[in-house]
């Protein structure tokens, strides 16, 4: 018996159990097995009758997971896992472990990306497919079932999160008290500036963290680096972000990848400061400066800015009393750092 195609497997589970006339507490038994006892295999959910376990296996497969691990790579503080998803495609997810014991996860929303940012490995692949809500949340569930603590989550892996509307189903799963039960404030969604879905984040998930990938304060240059700027111009995005702050009271993070000789000058820093100070809530913008991480598929003409330029840029922003940090580097040696995820695909010719 095949069930209707609800947005997530948890909805499909409810429908399936109802169709079998199972008591309503069966769903809770399954979710407790997964999220309380970390059991991912249906045949090991021994609180369920054997016949029901067999029915679940026949309908959903042996595991609750919809992703399949292919390769795991580890460095000192980082684990990167390559996962197979529907259509025989692949995505990557990253776990970062901090010395204080905190664990943070970076997950993908798309297989590849169709927006073509010129300095990004994922963008060099092109868009293979949008991930389902289950494929997004199962990247986390994979780590959780292995015993890891989901202290914070960011949609900063492969893909543009807000270009995949299924992310909103995924976010609902992550905050569902019967499922992952994550605090919205532990979740960060990154975007290049998809205005309609930023507005949807404002109304539907006001307490979640929002990061805007800016990378140049100049319209023409940003359009060259990030073609999406032609559809959603920087001026308009900044207005929408200001409205987001007004309605939520939450700060917005500005991600800025430092590209040597491209966007790392004092002129760029001063223009970035001017853009932020022109908004109603300049103290609620937090700039994250990110060292560029070249890898497979990224053009050779981009390089990492020199440390002196990075520090000068930092001082210009900080002197304007705008919160600013230089993001710590994790996982560069295993292609797990910012902008390096490419799912072992070959880059398209640009």
Swiss-Prot record:
Q: Where is the Radical SAM core domain?
A: 99-333
Q: Where in the cell is it found?
A: Cytoplasm
Which cofactors does the annotated protein need, by name? Answer: [4Fe-4S] cluster
* InterPro entries membership: Aldolase_TIM, Methyltransferase_A, RlmN_N, rRNA_lsu_MeTfrase_Cfr, rRNA_lsu_MTrfase_RlmN/Cfr, rSAM
Alphabetized GO MF terms = 4 iron, 4 sulfur cluster binding; metal ion binding; rRNA (adenine) methyltransferase activity; rRNA binding
Please verify whether the record's keywords include Iron.
Answer: yes
User: What are its GO cellular component terms?
Assistant: cytoplasm
One biological process term from GO is: tRNA methylation
Matching CDD domains: Radical_SAM (cd01335)
Q: Which SUPFAM superfamilies does this chain map to?
A: Radical SAM enzymes
EC main class here is transferase
UniProt binding sites for [4Fe-4S] cluster:
113, 117, 120
- Residue pairs linked by disulfide bridges in the UniProt entry: 106-338
- What is the cofactor note? Binds 1 [4Fe-4S] cluster. The cluster is coordinated with 3 cysteines and an exchangeable S-adenosyl-L-methionine.
Similarity field: Belongs to the radical SAM superfamily. RlmN family. Cfr subfamily.
Q: Which HAMAP family match?
A: 23SrRNA_methyltr_Cfr (MF_01873)
Question: What is the protein named?
Answer: Ribosomal RNA large subunit methyltransferase Cfr
């Amino acid at each position: 018996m095949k069930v209707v195609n609800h947005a997530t497997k948890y909805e499909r589970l409810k429908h399936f159990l109802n169709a079998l006339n199972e008591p309503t507490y069966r769903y809770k038994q399954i979710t407790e097995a997964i999220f309380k006892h970390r059991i991912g295999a249906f045949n090991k959910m021994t609180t369920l009758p054997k016949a029901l376990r067999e029915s679940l296996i026949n309908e959903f497969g042996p595991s609750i997971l919809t992703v399949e691990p292919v390769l795991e790579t580890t460095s000192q503080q980082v684990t990167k896992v390559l996962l197979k998803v529907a259509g025989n495609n692949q995505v990557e997810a990253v776990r970062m472990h901090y010395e204080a014991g905190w664990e943070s996860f970076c997950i993908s929303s798309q297989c590849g990306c169709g927006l073509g940012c010129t300095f990004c490995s994922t963008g060099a692949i092109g868009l293979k497919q949008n991930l389902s809500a289950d494929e997004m949340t199962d990247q986390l569930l994979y780590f959780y079932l292995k015993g890891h603590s989901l202290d914070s989550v960011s949609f900063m892996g492969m893909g543009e999160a807000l270009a995949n509307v299924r992310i909103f189903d995924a976010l609902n799963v992550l905050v569902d008290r019967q499922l992952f039960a994550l605090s919205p404030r532990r979740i960060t969604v990154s975007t290049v500036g998809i205005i309609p879905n930023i507005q949807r984040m404002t109304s539907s998930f006001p307490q979640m963290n929002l990061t805007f990938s800016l990378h140049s304060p100049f319209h023409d240059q940003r359009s060259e680096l990030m073609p999406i700027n032609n559809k959603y111009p920087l001026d308009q995005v900044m207005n929408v972000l200001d409205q987001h702050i007004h309605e939520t009271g939450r700060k917005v993070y500005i991600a800025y990848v430092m590209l040597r000789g491209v966007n790392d000058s004092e002129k760029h820093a001063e223009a970035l400061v001017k853009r932020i100070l022109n908004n109603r809530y300049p103290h609620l913008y937090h700039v994250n400066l990110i060292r560029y991480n070249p890898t497979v598929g990224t053009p050779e003409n981009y390089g990492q800015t020199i440390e002196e330029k990075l520090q000068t840029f930092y001082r210009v922003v900080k002197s304007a009393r705008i919160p600013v940090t230089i993001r710590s580097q994790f996982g560069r040696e295993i292609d797990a750092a910012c902008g390096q995820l490419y799912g072992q695909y070959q880059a398209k010719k640009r």
